[in-house]
Amino acid sequence: HSEESRRRTAENADRMLRSFEDMRAVHDFSFRRAVIFTAHCEGSVQDAYSPLDGDRILCADGGWKFAREAGVKPECVIGDFDSSEEPEGEAIERHPVMKDDTDTMLCVKRALKGGELDFLIVGGFGGRLDHTLANIQTMQYLAERGARAVMDDGITRAETLKEGKTRVSRKKGKLSVFSLTDKCEGVTIRGAKYE
């Protein structure tokens, strides 16, 4: 029952996204990108984040330090501040330590309420395994709602893919493709070592 409900929700989200994409193509308007700085970034913030006009910046807990390193001011710093001090001079949305969502998920939910459909999570890998897995689940949560999600820490980059074509630039490193669901059909890989 739950799996069927989740599938229907994802299908509805896909239809809505296609509708938004059609409207964007016809009316040439763009959606803002929500950029969420997490409290852990294994690599270079500058390699992970290139600013775009109109970026909506949110920070999950200690992610405010990486936002400052990137030279951007967050709309809000969201978290329980169990592992980081609160920043001076920033808008803060404080949550209890004992809660159902991670600080990153709280940022995602705030941005979704604002209508954002394009997400960059800066950091998110490395550090604690439970945080990495929770961030990957957060990307799946976004994909199920029709949003595009990228997580980049300057070393590793993950992106949710949906119907259509995606081109990956040839950079030094490795390419892996995984399904976050039990069924993934119609995927074709061309130009990679293993096709």
What are these regions (language model features)?
Residues 17-87:
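N-terminal beta-strand-loop-alpha-helix module at the start
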Residues 154-156, 161-195:
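Long, charged alpha-helical interface segments
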Residues 47-48, 131-135, 161-164, 189-190:
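A short secondary-structure junction signal
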Residues 2-9:
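A cross-taxon signal for low-complexity, glycine/charged-rich
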